[in-house]
Every structure is written in C-alpha cells, then in structure tokens.
C-alpha cells in the first residue's frame, strides 16, 4: 500500500527542439500534461500554447493515437488537437511533431495505463460524515514552503486576510486525528496554484489548473494526501470550480479565444440572484447578469459555453480524479453558470466515473429551489443537474435560529418540523448535505453566542438528520469567529502551527468547554458511523408541543428516538403519544450518556438538551 503511487508520478511534457536556433521552441505549454489509455471517452483535447502555432504542420508518430481534428481560434498562439486513443492502444510515450518549413519541434507525450477498476470507484454516500477544511488555516506541516519566490503573498499570520501557512503536509499529519474523530470523508477547498495579490489563501482564483500551489505543497503531495486518507479509511473530495478562474491565471495575458471569458465594457459583477433560474417570470437580462457577471473583480467569469473551454475544464478534473485517486466532487457556485451547460459538464465527468457522487453548492433559500438542483427531481422544464447531492442551506438557517427563539407556530423547534415536512419536494432527501456552517458563513459558535448547550443541540440535530453531515474544521472545539467577516469565519486551528501556545488537537490543549464539545461530537460521529439507522433509516416526526420536538429514525433492526427540549427549564414528556413507534418497548439508552430511560410513562428532559435514545 505504501508504494501505491510510485507508479503514478505526474509526468510533465518534454519539449525537444530538433534544430539549432534557440527561437524554435514554438510550443511552451501542453495541457493536460499526460493522459491515459482505456478511458470511456476515447478522444481527448490537447491544448498547445506558444508562439504562432497555427502556421505549423502537426503530425503524430504513434500506432494507437491519431489526430481526429485540429481546432484553431482567433489567437494564433494556440492550437487545440483532439486525439483519438484506440481501444487497443498501448501505454507509453509518443512524438507529436510540429514543422515549419525545414524546422521542427518534437513534443514527447505520454499515455499512462489507467488504474484497474478506476471507472468503478466508489464514492461518498449518505453513510459518510464530511470534514471541510481550508488548507491554509488548518495545520502547517512544512514551514519551508510558507513563502515562495515569484509569488505575491507569503505568510503573515497577524493579518487576517493574508496567508497563514497551512499546507498539505499539515493535513496529512492530522488524518489519523480525523479518523479517530469519526470522520469518513475529507473535503478541502481548492489546492490549485493561486498567485493573486490578495486573499490568495482561499485558492478559489486559480492561476494554473495543473499545478498544486507550491505554498501548499507539490503535485506529489496531493497524491500522498489521497493515499493517507485511504489508508485511514477516509474518502477524498475535490472542489470543482467551473464558474471562474483567477485574474493571475497564466492565460489572462493571452486568452486562447476572445470568448474564453465573459466580458463587459466595464467591470460588472453577477447579480448573485440564483432564484432567477427557477423564477417562471425571470427576465432574460437578469439571467444574463447572473451567468455572465463576474463573481469578484479578481475572478474572471469563464464562458463554459465555449466548447473548447468546456472540454479543457472537464479534462482538468478528470485528470486529478484519475491521478490522485479522488472519490467525489463538490461543485462551487453551480447556478452561476448556464445551468444546462453546467449539467452537461458534470455529466461528462460522471460518464468516466458512473458511481461518483457530486454535491453542488446551490445557495438558495427554499426547499423547492434546493430540490430543483438535485438529480432525479421531476422538474417541469425537465432540467436535470446531474448533482447527486445538494447543500441544504435551508436547514442551515433553521440551525442558526431555532435554539435562540421562543416557541411559536413557526419559530423554535417548529422550524425543524416545518422544514422536514417539505421533504416531499426532494428526489432523495437522504442524499442531502447538512451543515451548521462553512467557510462562507458565520461560525455556528456565533449563531448560538457560544452557549455550549445550544451548540450541542445543533450537533445532535445535525448528526441525526436525514441526509449526511458536513463538519467545518474547528466545529469540534466550538472554534470562534467574527460575524459578517469572511476572514472571521476562517481562524487558524489552535495547535496547527509549531509556535502556537496550545494544541487543541489534544485533550490537554483544549479548554473544558472545548473538550465537552469535542467528546460529544466524537460520540455522535462514531455512533453514526457504526449504525446504519442514522445513515439511511426512515424518519418519522411529531408536531412540536410545549417547546419539545420528537422525531424517530428507524429501520428493520433499530429505532432511535430524538427528543429536543428547547425550553430554558427541564420538561417532562409523556411518551404515550409515540406508541406507534415504541409500542411493546419498555426502555431505551441515551447514546451520549449511556443513561437508561423507561418508556412506560414519563421522561424528564433537561433544559436546552437533545436526548438521542436507542430503543431496546
């Protein structure tokens, strides 16, 4: 197992000039840097970038690879070759020859042998618990790469919006910690090169799709991260960003085509109104602004409707899935693209990996809108996103409000009841990703004003909800933040840096409150990991009464009763009302305390507490 990736180095294209003149290196960049035999789609795109390439005659010396077409754009410095790989093609290197008159340049390109069973790889499911982290803010395992010559930003931990030095090596060193916590899947925000002049730490403004940012590590380190995950029983999710690149991307100085990005006479942002896609009365102007406006001034809006860019980006993610043995995808800002093009884009990747699941960021505020984006939903317009999962921003809003409110018809615990009552709109409510917070919104600790009782209620409701949970790094220690401030959502994990005064990755390095939260979450995660009833079990809920909300998760072998008391006082619950679920059962054990409860008559529930009772 330790040598799994020795056969998968990222081989860069060799450019060999077969002439004496120094100026004959017409081709300066070839992407992707390698490809594979035995892919489902036999044809792949090869982008050549250099100087006046369109005047060159191009041939290939290979028995198993042929040029199926050559596509030119309005920029003479680019040529797009579509190469067809025969089904019986043998892996190895072959020559691509460019000729201008008597002068030639030879590119040595490599086809690798595809990993056996690659297309059948398994993905994350409703059985998983996902841990989201920002690499720059999690742990610094290699201080030597903190600042790199030629990159605008180095490390300044005292500046919230600067780079802080976390890296892939730091993540690798903490994989056993995540496995012990009960995490089964890791999602990192992007790792691609990002040489922006400010806020480059978030990595969402890519400068080079085939290069891991050297301040995070080397390309080979990403492979090591994947191996570490798999050796410890974790899956790995890649963050897919088809909507935009970074203004520092190498092609921004010489765009492959005029319509490679969406442009305006002056800078124009998106209107960010994703509701326009489901609005039956939406104007064309609003939809155009949504999809063609830029997400931010430093994030040029990619024109995914350009077929050359479409194929280029598709191959980027296939390349990394294949190279680093990735298990799943999360798609950033999905509705900011023309959604039918985005759907084809995701489908084209899943054609290579039929079992791969994909969760989409579709930041809308009603269940009907969220459901529209889950694959399999019977939409009136027949739209299918090809997203097997969606992020439940509606449930996130309930978590942020319910425990701070007094009970009313539509406040407090009634929020949970009313939201779950709308699950009929989903094609598959068990494949929805639930979360308390993430890197784009306020920390959950802020929402509940650092009240440990409320925080634990949120964790309990999250880990027992239909769908599957996503935990944001630091949630296990109730990490603090600053409301309404992106940088305030992304504090460093204490102990991730050698110079930190304490190490919250350890029991001794945590406060009493932090250990209480950590131990509680770990108990819930481990229980969920080992009990399918909380992964795929059916759900039944009862209308909240007197500030107490009860629901059940159940399957053929086990029943779990979840009792949430949102009152500031201890309450007594008469369980006779729930006889359809507990008839014939006499007792149950609360999974976080191991306390036994009689189911004969009354149960006392402490104030601001969720009991999770396994019925015997």
Task: Give residue ranges: language-model regions.
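Bacterial Sec-dependent N-terminal signal peptides
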Residues: 1-26
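Carbohydrate-interacting/catalytic domains
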Residues: 21, 92, 105, 112-129, ...
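Beta-strand/beta-sandwich contexts
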Residues: 22-54, 107, 111-116, 120
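Immunoglobulin-like IPT/TIG beta-sandwich domains and homologous Ig-like subdomains
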Residues: 39-102
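Extracellular/periplasmic catalytic domains that process cell-envelope and extracellular macromolecules
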Residues: 122-127, 179-181, 187, 229-231, ...
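Hydrophobic faces of well-ordered beta-strands that scaffold small-molecule active sites
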Residues: 129-131, 186-188, 236-238, 329, ...
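Substrate-binding/active-site clefts of carbohydrate-active enzymes
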Residues: 138-184, 188-318, 323, 342-352, ...
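Active-site-proximal helices and loops of the catalytic beta/alpha 8
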Residues: 226, 244, 316, 322, ...
